[in-house]
Swiss-Prot record:
Pfam families with a match to the protein in the record: Ribosomal_L12 (PF00542), Ribosomal_L12_N (PF16320)
Family of the protein in this entry: Belongs to the bacterial ribosomal protein bL12 family.
Residues that span the membrane, as ranges: none
NCBIfam families: L12 (TIGR00855)
GO biological process: translation
GO molecular function, one term: structural constituent of ribosome
Organism (species): Streptomyces avermitilis (strain ATCC 31267 / DSM 46492 / JCM 5070 / NBRC 14893 / NCIMB 12804 / NRRL 8165 / MA-4680)
Encoding gene, per UniProt annotation: rplL
The protein's name: Large ribosomal subunit protein bL12
One Gene Ontology term, aspect cellular component: cytosolic large ribosomal subunit
Intrachain disulfide bonds: none
InterPro entries, A to Z: Ribosomal_bL12, Ribosomal_bL12_C, Ribosomal_bL12_C/ClpS-like, Ribosomal_bL12_oligo, Ribosomal_bL12_oligo_N_sf
Ribonucleoprotein among keywords: yes
Quaternary structure and partners: Homodimer. Part of the ribosomal stalk of the 50S ribosomal subunit. Forms a multimeric L10(L12)X complex, where L10 forms an elongated spine to which 2 to 4 L12 dimers bind in a sequential fashion. Binds GTP-bound translation factors.
Amino acid sequence: MATKLSQEELLEQFESLTLIELAEFVKAFEEKFDVTAAAAVAAAPAGPVAAAEAAEEQDEFDVILTGAGDKKIQVIKVVRELTSLGLKEAKDLVDGAPKPVLEKVAKEAAEKAAESLKGAGASVEVK
C-alpha cells in the first residue's frame, strides 16, 4: 500500500521533474480530473461605475497634444523641454496633433506636463 505524501514531499518531487515532465503531468492531471490549469479570470462589471473605478486605479497616463493654438512656437519649446526631441521632431509632433507628447507617465508628471502645455497655449488631454 502506498504511503500518503505530505504537501512538502509532493513539492520536492515536482522540483525534481524537468519542465517537459511537469507539462506532461499537468496534461495528465487535467485529463484525469477533467479540469484546466488556466487561471480563472473574473468578469469586470459593466457600466459607468466600472469606468470610474478603472480611472481611479489607473497609474500610468498619456499626455496627448490635441492642438497647438495660436502660440505654436511656445508650444514647440515646451514640447522640447518635456521630451528629448530635437527642434524638427518637436515641430513635427506639434504640427501633427493630435499626438502623444508623453506616454505611460505618473499622474503627477502628466498633470505637470499638461499644465505646462496649456500655459503655452496648447490644448491637451490626459488619458
